[in-house]
Amino acid sequence: MALRILITVSLVLFSLSHTSFGYSPEEVKSWCGKTPNPQPCEYFLTQKTDVTSIKQDTDFYKISLQLALERATTAQSRTYTLGSKCRNEREKAAWEDCRELYELTVLKLNQTSNSSPGCTKVDKQTWLSTALTNLETCRASLEDLGVPEYVLPLLSNNVTKLISNTLSLNKVPYNEPSYKDGFPTWVKPGDRKLLQTTPRANIVVAQDGSGNVKTIQEAVAAASRAGGSRYVIYIKAGTYNENIEVKLKNIMFVGDGIGKTIITGSKSVGGGATTFKSATVAVVGDNFIARDITIRNTAGPNNHQAVALRSGSDLSVFYRCSFEGYQDTLYVHSQRQFYRECDIYGTVDFIFGNAAVVLQNCNIFARKPPNRTNTLTAQGRTDPNQSTGIIIHNCRVTAASDLKPVQSSVKTFLGRPWKQYSRTVYIKTFLDSLINPAGWMEWSGDFALNTLYYAEYMNTGPGSSTANRVKWRGYHVLTSPSQVSQFTVGNFIAGNSWLPATNVPFTSGL
């Protein structure tokens, strides 16, 4: 009997030590050794007292996600106290960006943690990739305005590393076969109809008073009182000098056509804004759709970064739209995006960001730059497990009217690596003679040349020859459909699961 009691007490004490005092050092080292950043994993896992059993990889993934969420929530709470410590307008502007971006990070981590049964690993990888991108954007805002990082000490490398660990544990193959043929399948049938017909508007914007409201922002505000279903804002022909923020889900902008319905702004880094806040139109709410609209930033070629559109909207679609600016025109910030039959004008890094984005049947126009060099893309992937990249499929790359007379004196490149794992692919795209024979340009010395992924597949036109392209380890000339299939609409942005509902035409494969 005494032996039985002793064994029982020993088992209870072992159980208490395991549940009340954290994981054993052996467990911690074994599991954290599977991540790219074991040190913060070991530290925070050791500190954890509300432990749950780790028996398999899925258990560890859940705990890794929980650690990232806990640290991100702590970092977010600190941002609220930092506003009063800002010493000038530049520091305040950077702080406001970081506050918003940490809120979005916590939102995405919660979305990943509390995802519905229908949520796929691709969805989770998208949201984790976005959470990581948000933290990087906070740092970029400090750099834009020359604010030293010690002024805003919320920038926790631990949060970044913990999210990176969770990304590596989710392990999504790029060609996961979970979609049907047709449009990217995240587009619902009702949304598809909206894009193929003239939809009935919930509200009409008209400068002459013939609509319900005179400004677009008024219409967006009205949508907040309408519930969460698809809300169509018809914007009549005219030039609207506004800076628009769309934070609600399921908003649709419908205009009267490119060059007819024009939204214009002029904020820029040169004028004191961050790149993030310079956008004429900024969209965060998921499932955003825009059709038949021009969006401009008129800050000019010498005011540095000046964004026309910034989209961080998951499952967003832009159809027959024009984006016009110079440096950093189209900010494909994060999440899954699709552009069809759009025009994009710019000079330096004018398609940039860290979304999983496909541009299909679009016209890309390089303008006359201030410094005799154009770069079409600057993709911002910071982690090898982020499911992000810029895919340019069946588009046309040509010189804009202001560049044509001086084209021979300007070097125009397909892109350059903004971040360590930058990924950009051109597929079956017409490249005119403006493209430099080297094709691609360095960002700074040999930075990222071995870790980037740049590729070309069956492009045409006088600028498409790969004979004199760069010889970087990360550059690839693809020669077979199997090599490029992971970058199609169907696979790269899971287009077959959401695009059909928008009624935007798209090509799922090559």
Curated annotation (Swiss-Prot):
GO molecular function term, any single one: pectinesterase activity
Main location: secreted
Signal peptide location: 1-19
UniProt subcellular location: Secreted, Cell wall
Tissue specificity of this protein: Expressed at low levels in young leaves, young bark, young fruit, mature fruit vesicles, shoots and flower buds, young bark and juice vesicles. In both leaf and fruit abscission zones, and mature leaves, expression was initially undetectable but increased markedly following ethylene treatment.
Pathway: Glycan metabolism; pectin degradation; 2-dehydro-3-deoxy-D-gluconate from pectin: step 1/5
Site positions (Transition state stabilizer): 327
Lineage: superkingdom: Eukaryota
InterPro entries recorded: Carb-bd_sugar_hydrolysis-dom, Invertase/methylesterase_inhib, Pectin_lyas_fold, Pectin_lyase_fold/virulence, Pectinesterase_Asp_AS, Pectinesterase_cat, Pectinesterase_inhib_dom, Pectinesterase_Tyr_AS
Keywords: Aspartyl esterase, Cell wall, Cell wall biogenesis/degradation, Disulfide bond, Glycoprotein, Hydrolase, Secreted, Signal
Residue numbers annotated as active site: 328 (proton donor), 349 (nucleophile)
Gene3D superfamilies in the cross-refs: Invertase/pectin methylesterase inhibitor family protein, Single-stranded right-handed beta-helix, Pectin lyase-like
Swiss-Prot/TrEMBL induction comment: By ethylene.
Misc note: The PMEI region may act as an autoinhibitory domain and prevent untimely PME activity during transport.
Family: In the N-terminal section; belongs to the PMEI family.
Annotated function: Acts in the modification of cell walls via demethylesterification of cell wall pectin.
Name of protein: Pectinesterase 2
Gene: PECS-2.1
